[in-house]
């Protein structure tokens, strides 16, 4: 089935775990949603309205640090997304709102606590092979993103999701989760002003504390850090120019400041739109041509509205007259990545390694 690349891509980016599929009201609303989800805006709003909530029976301690563990009560205090939450015990009914979020929980050995999952625009097949079997057995509560009512029907005591979940076009605002006494953890790299790989490590560290899986979290963080360090040690920075292409037939939905920009730098490339303030923004094809990327990253989706459009996306770029003189187009220099590989999660270095291979070929 032929899809509208622009609309499907915008919806997908707002949906994945990411978490807004099916909640927008139209193409223009989707554009506004992308723009309104700038990290600095969300961070500012949450910081100014910081609230304190507790899980289970709250301790009376007054935490001095963003994360602490009190020896007497075994309570864990977490600061996340402008909200301070005390966990007297590990959550028991967990709902991640994407497979990449679920994958981190499974990597920590928490699959038995997951009572349901929303697929967003992903599939368990997008995830790492070692986790696919366990992920495939999770109960799917909705294809896409749930309404708040559907989420409530699972009686969760913990939700793990991106910033989009709590926005205008997401599941529900933070206050609604608090009213229902549902604790949550918002993926740091989706609302940080300038996302870094350290945001991924912070997520895992905090989840390890919340679920009393510190040893597993440390092991997972160490394995990711070793890959990051190997790339930094072996990758040579180049002048190769890179552009990410998610979708678009009237304009390019591309990556600005965000974790994908960090990934491109780590791989030795230069994001031609690193000057954009938001993680995802639309730019004209003419501006893309002017900046003339040597490589174009294609975001691939396995399921959802954009199913099967990887080749279609590439073909649309090749046929676009505005791009006919672009180096990447003329030389067929495309690198395909799964969307989950360019969001803050376990697979970000897979994308970096794949991109670096192409950059190295061009830099010879």
List the predicted regions and their residue ranges.
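Bacterial Sec-exported substrate-binding components of ABC uptake systems
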Residues: 2-10, 14, 23-103, 209-244, ...
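Short helix-initiation/N-cap motifs at beta->coil->alpha
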Residues: 79-82, 138-149, 277-285
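Alpha-helical, coiled-coil/dimerization segments enriched in small aliphatic residues
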Residues: 121-125, 253-281
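Extracytoplasmic ligand-binding site segments that recognize negatively charged/polar headgroups
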Residues: 123-125, 163-172, 182-206, 243-261
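Structured C-terminal subdomain patch of bacterial secreted/periplasmic proteins
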Residues: 195-212, 216-218, 297-364
